[in-house]
């Protein structure tokens, strides 16, 4: 895929910003006005160029018919990959760019629900269900999880993979290894957030 021109990148960034701010892509007229094009037709030509480069899809017959195919248009070599998360800095979003070690060339749709990122497993606390040290855990980013599911949880500033159990204001994060005790979280005094649901494991490195 050819890289975007500076102008195409501006158009793409505007589309992303509008979707983030309003939930809807901009019209051609809005693109023209925001970026100083002489007409909506000029905006349309840039959209067609972005579609040819496969970073957006144009939906015919709709004034706001633009769908983003890539979240980061400048990461062309990552377009078919799932981000691999390494060390997570305290207080930072798990998908922050500085946490992404690389991308795996694997179809996220092979997992149900689909994988939004991969997390490198450290330690053997989940080995009894086949999640081993060094494995890549496929994770669907969601906070909608049920007791008994294996989740990626952030306790204060630590990220861990455990089986979830909730009892009132207490949360228990269970290991799948009898050598490890459950992590007990008192929600009245500690911070806990669910980063995602474990949906699969990759052990082979041949897909990188």
Curated annotation (Swiss-Prot):
It holds the Pfam family Peptidase_S24. It catalyses: Hydrolysis of Ala-|-Gly bond in repressor LexA. Keywords: Autocatalytic cleavage, DNA damage, DNA repair, DNA replication, DNA-binding, Hydrolase, Repressor, SOS response, Transcription, Transcription regulation. The active site is at residues 125, 162. GO terms for molecular function: DNA binding; serine-type endopeptidase activity. The record marks 90-91 as: Cleavage. The keyword Transcription regulation applies. Its EC number is 3.4.21.88. Residues 28-48 bind DNA. GO terms for biological process: DNA repair; DNA replication; negative regulation of DNA-templated transcription; proteolysis; SOS response. The keyword Lipid metabolism does not apply. Belongs to the peptidase S24 family. Homodimer. Represses a number of genes involved in the response to DNA damage (SOS response), including recA and lexA. In the presence of single-stranded DNA, RecA interacts with LexA causing an autocatalytic cleavage which disrupts the DNA-binding part of LexA, leading to derepression of the SOS regulon and eventually DNA repair. This is LexA repressor. It comes from Aliivibrio fischeri (strain MJ11) (Vibrio fischeri).
């Amino acid at each position: 895929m050819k890289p975007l021109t500076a102008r195409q990148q501006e158009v793409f960034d505007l589309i992303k910003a509008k979707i983030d701010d309003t939930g809807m892509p901009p019209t051609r007229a809005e693109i023209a006005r925001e970026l100083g094009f002489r007409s909506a037709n000029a905006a349309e030509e840039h959209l067609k160029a972005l579609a040819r480069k496969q970073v957006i899809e144009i939906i015919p017959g709709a004034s706001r018919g633009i769908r983003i195919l890539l979240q980061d248009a400048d990461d062309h070599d990552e377009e078919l990959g799932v981000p691999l998360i390494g060390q997570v800095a305290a207080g930072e979003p798990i998908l922050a760019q500085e946490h992404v070690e690389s991308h795996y060339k694997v179809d996220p749709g092979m997992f149900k629900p689909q994988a939004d990122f991969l997390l490198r497993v450290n330690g053997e606390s989940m080995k009894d269900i086949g999640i081993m040290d060094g494995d890549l855990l496929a994770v669907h980013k969601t906070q909608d999880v049920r007791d008994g599911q294996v989740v990626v949880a952030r306790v204060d500033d630590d990220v861990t993979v455990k089986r979830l159990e909730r009892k009132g204001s207490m949360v228990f994060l269970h290991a799948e290894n009898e050598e490890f005790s459950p992590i007990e979280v008192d929600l009245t005094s500690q911070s806990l957030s669910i980063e995602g649901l474990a949906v699969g494991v990759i052990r082979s490195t041949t897909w990188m």
